[in-house]
Design a protein with these regions (language model features):
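Rossmann-like flavin
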Residues: 94-176
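Mid-domain catalytic core of redox enzymes
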Residues: 223-336
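Feature captures the FAD/FMN-dependent oxidoreductase FAD-binding
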Residues: 91-109, 134-137, 210-211, 215-216, ...
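A conserved FAD-binding loop/helix module that cradles the flavin
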Residues: 55, 444-466
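A glycine-rich dinucleotide-binding beta-alpha-beta segment and adjacent secondary-structure elements
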Residues: 154, 158-168, 384-448
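Helical element adjacent to the flavin cofactor pocket in flavoenzyme catalytic cores
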Residues: 181-232
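N-terminal glycine-rich phosphate/pyrophosphate-binding loop and immediately adjacent elements
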Residues: 1-122
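C-terminal segments that line or cap access tunnels to active or ligand-binding sites in enzymes
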Residues: 292-399
Length: 469
């Protein structure tokens, strides 16, 4: 069968494209190399508990807010979303001080002005930026760090407004203001957790895809995109099966996608060199904890904990874990106590490079000891805001950038895809279109990462595809 659209990769971007195109009446197939679809949205099960991989909270789902209309279109507003605390959806702890980030632009200013009264005018300017998001062509060339340090006089306040660093990679020399404000703005509008796993989103989208006649094929790993007359004709898999199509969308990292085009005559060398040369953001180390029953009351916010006021540079420290994000899973049984929390911290690929040739579950004792040490350090840091956490732990599971690489094909286990660079923005911001007229890209590597970024990019990919046709 020759499909109208062949989509490679079943992450959020791929599934959104598939749903929308299938509902337009096109014949669509989604090819997924893993046995379970969903990419970074999928959850995994251990000892009766479901754990999320990449989804922890979402911003801007309220009416009139950033993601509301898109999620309404996708049928995702019907899922059991729980709104986080308005007085402090994120609690930022730096050293021994804790500062809440409050929902709503006015409340955000009022709350932080209570700690920094002399910075109220600067906070109002900052919120104006969040409220009226600047055009990409202007803000992509501005350094986020330079902007913040010129706006605020108090270095501690720069650290506080930047402290949700686990949602993006903070690099003083390269992070564009565009990426920074888009990664924060929707969460200030409103922040939400799913009462359940990320699989709820995956299953909802797949249900709609199948209802519209689309197909999902798992355990189908692409190894080659075959060309004919300057266009992609088919995607060939490891088992020899080919999926023929008129249009192709890759929800896989662009560098991996180009690896399927080694003998391409349609792909020019300039484009290949550009994509190959792009750097990737850092990966994440995650500890998924199952807590003993009735030991920790549920907290309806996220906790960001830093050893000291070096939010922009803590990943460069050599003295152990310097920052951690703590996210609690909403109790699904109505309990007031939480059974599962995740701890996350950035992890350099240099800590993984000695194990790059290993497989999941077979990386050796040194790797396991390194993970245990890092997990202990994260828990110790988290105990600054959750006293006695270590004694509450029943079981724990860990993952590293190697895990992400092996499951999602993200080079170096990158958590946020290609690194955007304000010094060379045109090189690092990618279009859904490629030099091959019927091959398109989607996903977090193009313009913006995160749920919001991937959702908007998917709709942009669909629009590009329709204009090209």
């Amino acid at each position: 069968m020759k499909y109208d659209v062949v989509i490679i990769g079943s992450g959020l971007g791929g599934l959104i494209c598939a749903r929308q195109l299938a509902q337009q009446g096109r014949s669509v197939v989604v090819i997924e190399r893993q046995r379970q679809p969903g990419g970074c949205l999928q959850s995994f099960r251990r000892d009766g508990f479901h754990f999320d991989t990449g989804l922890h909270y979402v911003g801007g789902l309220g009416k009139g807010q950033t993601l509301h209309d898109a999620f309404e279109t996708l049928g995702l507003l019907e899922l059991p979303w729980q709104r986080l605390d308005a007085d402090g959806f994120d609690q930022i702890t730096i050293g021994r001080q804790t500062f809440p980030l409050a929902e709503g632009y006015d409340r955000f200013v009022d709350t932080l002005s209570g700690y920094f009264p002399q910075e109220r005018e600067a906070l109002n300017k900052f919120v104006e930026l969040l409220l009226h998001l600047p055009p990409m062509q202007e803000s992509i060339q501005v350094s986020a760090y330079d902007y913040l340090t010129s706006l605020f006089h108090a270095p501690l306040l720069v650290n506080i407004v930047s402290a949700t660093a686990m949602k993006m990679e903070l690099r003083r020399e390269s992070l564009p203001l565009f990426t920074f404000v888009y990664s924060l703005s929707s969460y200030v509008q409103s922040s939400w957790r799913l009462k359940g796993s990320g699989n709820l989103i995956v299953h909802s989208l797949i249900k709609d895809i199948k209802a519209a006649g689309g197909e999902i094929c798992c355990n189908a790993e692409v190894v080659q995109l075959q060309e004919s007359n300057g266009r992609i004709a088919a995607a060939r898999c490891t088992d020899g099966k080919s999926f023929e199509g008129r249009l192709f969308i890759s929800d896989v990292h662009p560098q991996v996608t180009l690896g399927w085009l080694t003998d391409s005559k349609a792909l020019n060398g300039t484009y290949r060199r550009r994509i190959t040369a792009l750097e990737n953001t850092m990966g994440m180390f995650t500890i998924s904890l199952v807590l003993k029953a009735n030991t920790l009351p549920y907290f309806n916010h996220n906790k960001y904990v830093y050893r000291k006021a070096n939010v922009w540079t803590f990943t460069e420290d050599v003295g152990g874990i310097g920052g951690v994000m703590i996210s609690a899973r909403v109790p699904e049984d109505g309990s007031t106590y939480v059974r599962q929390i995740d701890l996350m911290t950035p992890m350099s690929w240099t800590l993984c490079q000695h194990f790059t040739d290993t497989m999941v579950g077979r990386r050796g004792q040194i790797y396991e000891l390194q993970k245990e040490r890092m997990a202990d350090e994260c828990i110790q840091l988290a105990e600054g805001v959750i006293p006695g956490l270590r004694a509450m732990v029943e079981t724990r599971y860990t993952s590293t950038p190697l895990t992400w690489r092996d499951y999602t094909l993200s080079p170096f286990g990158s958590a946020f895809g290609i690194r955007k660079d304000c010094r060379n923005p045109l090189m690092t911001m990618l279009s859904p279109k490629t030099p091959i007229p019927n091959l398109f890209l989607t996903g977090q590597n193009l313009a913006l990462h995160g749920i919001e970024g991937v959702t908007k990019t998917a709709f942009n990919t669909i629009e590009s595809l329709e204009f090209s046709v």
